[in-house]
Amino acid sequence: MEIALYCDIVRNNNTKSKRFGQHGIVLTTSTSCAYVNYQDGFTAYCAVKHLTLVKHFRLDERIGDESVYYRGYWGRLKLVDANDNVRTLSREEMWALAQKYIHRTAVVV
């Protein structure tokens, strides 16, 4: 099983929306829909097909000294260290992770 990191620029046709052009990110195992977190804290339900795939992570992949661990729905990504301590990735860490891999896509955060 893999978890995917997606990035998004709000592409709706409502140019008057205060979120138009903002960047959003999501980590999810879903291939259809997911909740996308935007820079101002807004969360939107979005079809994955409208997002840009940034990176796939295997569930045993290392991020620093921790391994990727997934539980629950809508991209609640957790990391587990060598001592089996589990923690949820924070919003700031999600953005840092997106920025680490974003150069592989046309989207710039």
Which functions belong to the PLM regions below?
Residues 54-72:
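Short N-terminal "domain-start" leader segments
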